[in-house]
């Protein structure tokens, strides 16, 4: 009996020593540690395209206005006037134009053409929702010998904010200019006006590029 008790004591002491050495573990622990990976999530800051940032929306006497000059060496003011008038008369009838779009004024002696445009800016279109605004603007083509100056001005939107008030008129000067569409540091676009600013700039570029391409082919 004494020997039996001594044996038990010896076994207990041995197990204590083994546990103290910290060499025992669950059989699945090592596998778990091997398979354990540390995932580090790095959040990338969205970098805005410089074409939409500070200075992209120009103003003239506090009004949003874009102007491009198209040099046409060898063309008289009358020739350019005729070309621009023909182009704008077709432009106001293009598929994206609404019925209100039209060539509204001309000054034959000063070679100036004014067109009023009304079209949709579609921000998002899905099976379940449609987010869009009416873009209204004026194009002025001023023709001189060897040059056409094309100006986009009088820009405003009509937008339904789903507040029960229907379409609300929003001026470009209170939405897409630097003051309203950019944060104080001029490093980010402000949520809400960002989509208006991006799409209006894109549309302006498209209008000017198409006009420039048309004249270049003449």
Residue ranges and their predicted role:
Residues 1-25:
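Bacterial Sec-dependent N-terminal signal peptides
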Residues 21-218:
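Ser/Thr-rich, low-complexity intrinsically disordered terminal regions
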